[in-house]
Amino acid sequence: MNMTDPIADMLTRIRNGVRVKLPKVDIPKSRLKAEIARILKDEGYIANFKIIESEHQGAIRVFLKHGQGDERVITDLQRVSRPGCRIYCGKTEIPRVYGGLGINILSTSRGVMTGREAARTGVGGEIICNIW
């Protein structure tokens, strides 16, 4: 099946896994998805991730974090820039997610990074998603 938006598929798999408290989810591998998983791990939204190599595409196994009781570590993930409507921002226009409680992930000329890192390094780019 041809997938129109693989990043939205990744975010949906993580969102659904968190909601039903799965220990892990598998996602088809790509470099961009691996970078997004690295940022989610560094920011504390997921426990870990592992790249599983195969002779075809491979996969990224994401180990999810869960809070106490009904509390979630990831409340929601929102795709911002889509294949049909790209959203870009300059270095001074990077939006804050829920007053600084969440993060946004940007694809910049210096690689994939959070909005805070992009503002600190002085680069703008395409807003991939928001996580809170």
Language model: regions and residue ranges:
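Core subunits and conserved enzymes of cellular information-processing
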Residues: 1-132
